[in-house]
Amino acid sequence: MLSWPAPQIPRLPGTGEPVRVLDTATGRLVVAATGPHARLYVCGITPYDATHLGHASTYVAFDVLVRAWLDEGKTVTYASNVTDVDDPLLERATATGVDWRDLAAQQTALYASDMTTLGVVPPDVYRGVVESVPQVVAAVDALLSRDAAYRLPAPDGGDDVYADLSADPGFGSVAGLEHAAMLALSAERGGDPDRPGKRSPLDPLLWRAERPGEPAWDAPGLGRGRPGWHVECAVIASDGLGVPFDVQGGGSDLAFPHHESSASHLRVLTGTPQPAAAHVHTGMVGYRGHKMSKSLGNLVLVSQLVADGVEPMAVRLAVLAHRYRSDWEWTDDVLATAQQRVARWRRALSGNGGPAAQPVLDGVRAAVADDLDTPRALAVVDAWATAALAGEVPFEEGAPGVVARTVDALLGVRM
């Protein structure tokens, strides 16, 4: 699967500080990547109703992490997926009378266009589930051969395959939830804890036997069917990055059961106790009092904002004005503030000189290194813009150019 064009990232003088992020599994700030090669996996979209502000908030946040790593001088490998076959996609295709493959292709292309518009660095490894089916089949076969999975007769013939969580004593270490909370979230987020015959209610689906009217693939030894959700990301991450890797990223609603189960699969498949050194999760974006959600339909789409004439960098700044791991609400005021900020920064940057640029570079670097504190980074640039527009500070030739390159390179905001 092809990704989107990479934006040009300006080179800045010096190097950035080591970036620390909040690890969900431990609740502590940790160095995001300790070696010279940083490896990141971020769960991608299920391609329908792309790309809403919840998506954008997540991918912009991890884009800042990638940019900070590059500023440190690290080599970065970024992997992501597209869940281009899944129940919600199939349900939407049926409801709209569109072939599921056409819907997935159209929405994946729209997502790529939106990421290009927002200046997001594309993944180096970008794979759809459909193209990864052979690798998923091999992983499920391996789990069965190790007695870490089992078969359960499907209603229409053939066998579904489930992971046996008793093979992984580490299950639960990512989200750190009580059993009752895990059961509730499993039922809410695509699991089937009440299915009869399962060894444990939380055992996740690895392979779904063919059902009438659903896509399926031949899999010798498994029978025709399609992959379960969690094993897809486990396979794409391990194939694209190797195990262990540095950061597993995604929205906070993916911590359980998705990231919990993917990590479990990788532990059993690879024998690696901690497949991702850190799990980093972004907050939820709300709109009109509820989490922005495809099921609720309360979506604000990037493409619609841009079609309505909103400056793309204002959309990006609206996201960056909030701490990545905090929940926040999209409002007209949030957008208006971001639009005013873009205009103000551009006025301040329009001259040949201005206040000293080095404090801005140092301040933005320090903010980004401190758990991607983009609101603090914006405040640093705001202060410089205020001083520049007031014209009451010593004048430094070329300062606006350095500031513009700083916000472009580290925040992805092109002036």
From Swiss-Prot:
GO molecular function terms attached to this record: ATP binding; cysteine-glucosaminylinositol ligase activity; cysteine-tRNA ligase activity; zinc ion binding
An annotated GO BP: mycothiol biosynthetic process
Gene3D superfamilies with a match to the protein in the record: Anticodon-binding domain of a subclass of class I aminoacyl-tRNA synthetases (1.20.120.640), HUPs (3.40.50.620)
Species per Swiss-Prot/TrEMBL record: Cellulomonas flavigena (strain ATCC 482 / DSM 20109 / BCRC 11376 / JCM 18109 / NBRC 3775 / NCIMB 8073 / NRS 134)
Reactions performed catalytically: 1D-myo-inositol 2-amino-2-deoxy-alpha-D-glucopyranoside + L-cysteine + ATP = 1D-myo-inositol 2-(L-cysteinylamino)-2-deoxy-alpha-D-glucopyranoside + AMP + diphosphate + H(+)
Phylogenetic lineage: Bacteria, Bacillati, Actinomycetota, Actinomycetes, Micrococcales
Described purpose of this protein according to its UniProt entry: Catalyzes the ATP-dependent condensation of GlcN-Ins and L-cysteine to form L-Cys-GlcN-Ins.
Residues reported in the UniProt entry to bind L-cysteinyl-5'-AMP: 43-46, 58, 81-83, 229, 251-253, 285
Record key words, sorted: ATP-binding, Ligase, Metal-binding, Nucleotide-binding, Zinc
Motif ('ERGGDP' region): 188-193
Cofactor note: Binds 1 zinc ion per subunit.
Ligand binding (Zn(2+)): 43, 233, 258
Protein name as annotated: L-cysteine:1D-myo-inositol 2-amino-2-deoxy-alpha-D-glucopyranoside ligase
Motif ('HIGH' region): 45-55
A cellular component annotation (GO) from this entry: cytosol
Entry cofactors: Zn(2+)
Top-level taxon in the UniProt lineage: Bacteria
Residues annotated as signal peptide: none
Enzyme Commission numbers on file: 6.3.1.13
Sequence motif: 'KMSKS' region, positions: 291-295
